[in-house]
Amino acid sequence: MVKNTINLQDIFLNQVRKEHIAVTIYLTNGFQLKGLVKGFDNFTVVLDTDGKQQLVYKHAISTISPMKSVNLIFNEQGKE
């Protein structure tokens, strides 16, 4: 029996990346970063702000707030 685990973090980040939804990333020190998610892995998020890329470590992130609602897809068809 195969157990499917839902990784909400990856689903959320992948959707904002694919749909080009602008986000505000709030860091644990209170700083805000705004831009588009270009990629991510287990430890980092790449954010594009006005053509400049920033590699942000996930342990420094407090909150990610999208500029519009994100359609969360929980099935295998949503993976790319």
Curated annotation (Swiss-Prot):
Keywords from the named record: RNA-binding, Stress response
Gene Ontology annotations of biological process type: regulation of DNA-templated transcription; regulation of RNA stability; regulation of translation, ncRNA-mediated
Pfam families per record: Hfq (PF17209)
Domain Sm: 10-70
A GO MF label: RNA binding
CDD domains found in the cross-reference section: Hfq
Entry GO CC: cytosol
Family: Belongs to the Hfq family.
Function in brief: RNA chaperone that binds small regulatory RNA (sRNAs) and mRNAs to facilitate mRNA translational regulation in response to envelope stress, environmental stress and changes in metabolite concentrations. Also binds with high specificity to tRNAs.
Oligomeric and partner information: Homohexamer.
The protein's name: RNA-binding protein Hfq
